[in-house]
Amino acid sequence: MKTNNVVYCGNVDNKLVGKEVVIKGWIKKNRKLGSLIFIDIYDITGIVQVVVEEENKFFNNCLQTPKESVVEVIGIVRKRSNVNKELKTGEFEIDLKEFKLYSKAETPPFLIQDDTDGLEDLRLKYRYLDLRRPVMQNNIINRGKIINLFRSFLVKNNFNEIETPYLSKQTPEGARDYLVPTRSKKFFALPQSPQIYKQLLMVSGMDRYFQIARCFRDEDLRADRQPEFTQIDIETSFLSDLEIQSIVQEMFIYVFKEFFNIKLKTPFTRMSYSDAIEYYGSDKPDIRFENKIMNLTNYFKDTNFKIFKSIYESKNRISAVFVEDNIVKQDIKKLEKLAQDNKAKGLAYLYIENGKMSSGSIANVIESEIIEKICKDNKLSNGTLFFVADKYEITQQALGAIRKEFVNISKKIKMNEEFAFLWVVDWPLFEYSEEEKRYVSAHHPFTMPTAETLDTFDKDPANAKAIAYDLVLNGFEIGGGSLRIYNSELQTRMFKFLGLNDSQVKEKFGFIINAFKYGVPPHGGIAFGIERILMIMLNTNSIRDVIAFPKNSSGVDLLFETPSDVSNESLKELGIKLEK
């Protein structure tokens, strides 16, 4: 008679020894040793071993059932004679009495195990198989747990979870919108963020809002980007930027304590945008290690090295970064290409021994006494010193990329901590777009200028500052926020500076300008990219590893083969004609 004692594979334990149980799951492997068959059956909780004796009527069925088939087994739990310490259930096995095949599996296209042989695109094509791997299941399960920790903290701190629409209005926010055609021959747009909605909720008096929001951006993809992604979106009324940052810090303290049982180093480090560029060559620096960029321009005032002399006289920059390791030539070639990819004309280097120059690409043309003074002043002893000489923006960008690469090519980089949070503050209000030949918002057009630049931001945009703040974790921007403009005249002035005329302002943003006429509180907020946070917390190589069904690096869903063509009938019904 069948038992009702259904047990998950990973939950077989000492309390069940001698009892009859039912387990249901997938066959990980089966092997015949003499007169016995050993079957490893797994489910989402783990693996358990099943033993089938030769005289058992299901012996041949078990032997012939392929891996990854779905089965049900009834049997008696007993202690194993040879314990497998790598398994949670390694002390136990199940003596099979009955066997049922639910679904027979074909041979999978790759090994379904953590150290799989499947390349990423193949695994994405068969994502339902990839998600059987324990590491992937843990990622997806932990995603839900971590999101719920964020939600729990915010609810406890009087934030209201409010959903905003997916079918929205097209707005110029820096990336391309996904447009949704309708039968009325008009279009919705999928939101790049709930920015305007959450500001309107502040006008509505909702005080503290949050949402686990889906966002959509049709832009170039990188290792840490997806066309659709999830944000923890937050907005508050009447709080200062420092008060918002304090809540955020407490939120991460709570999440990391609950998930990892660790105490984060607090308060989070603060750094101005200009210092981040000056010392790290990045607006999202990884501060787990030092290796700061050095301004060495003045050391070369009297050099005979023509390139550096020319840079000094033209009032450009000679910057350098040092690593306490002798970087091999093969890796130097990689760094040279990396510098060129970041607009530098070249990368010079010197090997330093005991505070003196020993060799390198410019060792024959640079004065040794200058290098010795640099080493003495900056306490450089043994390692490799890299130089870029160019315009300031280029030297910092190139050396910032090289500094970041040190982690991958040198084993001597000393990480000070596992998780290094950093607030980057004092942002410029605008950045200059070489492509558009004009100033654009560094964050978005709703960002409040600082009090010092409130009257001059549209006359002197290069020096305009924003009350904006980014949160960086281990060299990744995980969140960005600001205080918002809450005056309709100031908001209109901002739109006009950004190139919108009166009719465009009315068409695209008339609703928020009108809302601001009916009493709007000072407000501000922040939004966090869930996938980037998870990628760091769960130590994965890509955000695709923490999304159940992601797109690949080209924005293609290989499982569903989308984006895909649409029938002419569907296009005709929507009044759309595609150009060839």
Curated annotation (Swiss-Prot):
Q: Which residues are recorded as binding L-aspartate?
A: E173, R217, H443, R484
Q: Which PROSITE patterns match?
A: AA_TRNA_LIGASE_II (PS50862)
Q: What InterPro entries does UniProt report for this protein, alphabetically?
A: Aa-tRNA-synt_II, aa-tRNA-synth_II, aa-tRNA-synth_II/BPL/LPL, Asp-tRNA-ligase_1, Asp-tRNA-ligase_1_N, Asp/Asn-tRNA-synth_IIb, AspRS_core, GAD-like_sf
Question: Its GO CC terms?
Answer: cytoplasm
- Per UniProt, what is one Pfam family of this protein? GAD
Task: List where this protein forms a coiled coil.
Answer: none
Q: What is its EC number?
A: 6.1.1.12
Tell me where in or outside the cell this protein is found: Cytoplasm
Membrane recorded as keyword: no
Q: Where is this region: Aspartate?
A: 195-198
Give the record's GO biological process terms: aspartyl-tRNA aminoacylation
Q: Which residues bind ATP?
A: R217, D218, E219, Q226, E477, G529, I530, E531, R532
**Which keywords, in A-to-Z order, does the entry hold?**
Aminoacyl-tRNA synthetase, ATP-binding, Cytoplasm, Ligase, Nucleotide-binding, Protein biosynthesis
Catalysed reactions, semicolon-separated: tRNA(Asp) + L-aspartate + ATP = L-aspartyl-tRNA(Asp) + AMP + diphosphate
Cross-referenced Gene3D superfamilies, in alphabetical order?
A: Bira Bifunctional Protein, Domain 2 (3.30.930.10), GAD-like domain (3.30.1360.30), Nucleic acid-binding proteins (2.40.50.140)
Instruction: Give this protein's Gene Ontology molecular function annotations.
Output: aspartate-tRNA ligase activity; ATP binding; nucleic acid binding
Q: Does the keyword Ligase apply?
A: yes
Q: Which HAMAP family match?
A: Asp_tRNA_synth_type1
Q: What does this protein do?
A: Catalyzes the attachment of L-aspartate to tRNA(Asp) in a two-step reaction: L-aspartate is first activated by ATP to form Asp-AMP and then transferred to the acceptor end of tRNA(Asp).
Record family assignment:
Belongs to the class-II aminoacyl-tRNA synthetase family. Type 1 subfamily.
Assembly information from the UniProt record: Homodimer.
The family database entries (NCBIfam families) matched by this protein are listed as:
aspS_bact, PRK00476.1
Q: What is this protein called?
A: Aspartate--tRNA ligase
UniProt gene name: aspS
